[in-house]
Swiss-Prot record:
GO terms for biological process: ceramide biosynthetic process; sphingosine biosynthetic process. Pathway: Lipid metabolism; sphingolipid metabolism. The keyword Lipid metabolism applies. It comes from Oryza sativa subsp. japonica (Rice). Serine palmitoyltransferase (SPT). The heterodimer formed with LCB1 constitutes the catalytic core. InterPro entries: Aminotrans_II_pyridoxalP_BS, Aminotransferase_I/II_large, AON_synthase_class-II, PyrdxlP-dep_Trfase, PyrdxlP-dep_Trfase_major, PyrdxlP-dep_Trfase_small. GO terms for cellular component: endoplasmic reticulum membrane; serine palmitoyltransferase complex. It catalyses: L-serine + hexadecanoyl-CoA + H(+) = 3-oxosphinganine + CO2 + CoA. Heterodimer with LCB1. Component of the serine palmitoyltransferase (SPT) complex, composed of LCB1 and LCB2. The keyword Lipid metabolism applies. This is Long chain base biosynthesis protein 2b. Belongs to the class-II pyridoxal-phosphate-dependent aminotransferase family.
Length: 499
């Protein structure tokens, strides 16, 4: 997927960034002058934020400038506290600032907002008739934490049961649990590959994958996003050239992709990538954080959706904090690989194991999905999120928004581009009781700021229509409908009423 930014949009976006950058440096120059003239008065707000004599400043350079001059202007749009469960609607705590957004203070007031921000894909984050009683019982039996790692005293029967259930669910021989999704990638990848190995990573892979790849010590090469042809070209070059300087053969090669890319909502071209990897005898590692549970006829992710045999993906990673309403992550692979990880991965050996109630939540949610609770609620949830996602995406496109991603994906970003329009859109939606997430640089390229919508099975059709009406009105207000509006004679969704 290549996003072609219109020339006028690119020019105005760069102008906006340039304006903020220029005025930011101008203010810093005046502050430096004031610090020379009135050192004690101006030091308290120095750019480095560090006034202790004799100590090197901790916060310096471009990162410090970006935080002070760019992010501070919009930080009220991020990290908004909530005061309820992250269901289809939740309570957002109102905040205020008396110092130009340097600090934000919570009030006692809350706003009930439509939740288009959370990764609660199947709605399990709310109280559930099957899951919640079992989670409460596990809390009474095991307490909130094991206070130990899996290799010490933190290995409960629940952990063993969930590993077996995960392996069965994703159709792999074995699995390992970790207490955090991010750490699953950042800690597992260095345990799989090291110096003398080659990692070939998609250019838009998640930061946790990037961190894990860098920590591994392996050589890293990046292929064009979701481009199997470029992947094959890169593999041929690297295999023929060998390791840097010595030109010895690589000890192992690992290709890393995501099932659904979290900032694009785009499905991985898995069949084509698997074909290339098989041809050159290299290992595949797929992150299914946003796809497991959310796509596929029975919720088994991208492999099921695209008709790929799970045996063809050597290592499958997933998080438990999205579709399953809990926390943690897993790796599913062959028994030999999982045994190796259990003996070598620092997060497994030294890190505290998953909280038992969190483990029980995943067990219960997974059983609902599999229909082992004696109902068809799981199948209905999977059908509901597919219908909700495709309906919402279709309506956004009809309204003229530039929507990224593929059908069936519950992640649907639409382009905003201009850095001033992102916070304006977010704040105006919040005023109208709709919570959305703006995403900009450095999480995305400089020109490609966007709003990311996440859909849940817990959303009713009325909820989605309400969200579409607000998004359409605010989109008109801030001017982010970059595509022609589809002319149809029909529903109030295409021609939203004034709120």
């Amino acid at each position: 997927m290549v996003i072609k930014v219109p020339y006028v949009t690119a020019a105005t976006t760069l102008f906006s960034f340039g304006l903020i950058f220029g005025f930011g440096h101008l203010r810093d120059s005046f502050r430096a002058l004031l610090r020379l003239l009135f050192s004690s008065a101006a030091a308290a707000d120095s750019p480095a934020g560090c006034n202790s004599k004799g100590y090197a400043p901790i916060c310096v350079g471009k990162e410090d400038f970006y935080i002070r001059r760019f992010f501070r202007r919009v930080q009220d749009c991020f990290g908004r506290p909530i005061a309820s469960k992250p269901d289809a609607w939740f309570d957002v705590v109102e905040r205020y600032s008396t110092d130009s957004n340097k600090t934000l203070h919570c009030t006692t007031k809350t706003s009930k907002c439509l939740n288009l921000a959370s990764f609660n894909y199947l709605g399990f984050a709310a109280a559930d008739e099957y899951c919640t009683p079992r989670v409460i019982e596990s809390l009474k039996k095991y307490s909130a934490s094991t206070c130990s790692s899996r290799v010490d005293g933190g290995n409960t029967q629940l952990h063993i049961e969930l590993e077996e259930l995960v392996a069965r669910f994703v159709r792999k021989p074995s699995a390992i649990l970790l207490a955090m999704g991010y750490a699953t990638n950042s800690a597992i990848i260095p345990a799989l590959i090291g110096k003398g190995g080659l990692i070939i990573s998609d250019s838009l892979n998640h930061n946790s994958i990037v961190s894990g790849a860098r920590a591994s010590g392996a050589t890293i090469r990046v292929f064009e996003h979701n481009n199997p042809a470029h992947l094959e070209k890169l593999l041929r070059e690297q295999i023929s050239g060998g390791q840097p300087r010595t030109h010895r053969a690589w000890k192992k090669i690992l290709v890393i992709v995501e099932g659904i890319y979290s900032m694009e909502g785009e499905l991985c071209k898995l069949p084509e990538i698997i074909s290339v990897c098989k041809k050159y005898k290299v290992y595949t590692y797929m992150d299914e954080a946003h796809s497991i549970g959310a796509v596929g006829k029975t919720g088994r992710g991208v492999c099921e959706l695209l008709g790929v045999d799970p045996a063809d993906v050597d290592i499958m990673m997933g998080t438990l904090s999205k579709s399953f309403g809990s926390s943690g992550g897993y790796i599913a692979a062959s028994k030999e690989i999982i045994q190796h990880l259990k003996l070598t991965c620092p997060s497994h050996i030294y890190g505290t194991s998953m909280s038992p109630p969190a483990v029980q939540q995943v067990i219960s949610a997974m059983k609902v999905i599999l229909g082992e609770d004696g109902t068809d609620r799981g199948a209905k949830k999977i059908a509901q999120i597919r219908d909700n996602s495709n309906f919402f995406r279709s309506e956004l496109q009809k309204m003229g928004f530039e929507v990224l991603g593929d059908n069936d994906s519950p992640v649907m970003p639409f382009m905003v581009y201009n850095p001033a329009k992102m916070p304006a859109f977010s704040r105006e939606c919040l005023k109208q009781n709709v919570a959305v997430v703006p995403v900009g640089f450095p999480a995305t390229p400089l020109l490609l700021g966007r709003i990311r919508i996440c859909i849940s099975a817990s959303h009713s059709r009325e909820d989605l229509i309400k969200g579409l009406e607000v998004i359409s009105n605010v989109g008109d207000l801030v001017g982010i409908k970059y595509l022609p509006v589809e002319q149809e004679e029909t529903t109030s969704v295409e021609k939203p009423k004034k709120l």
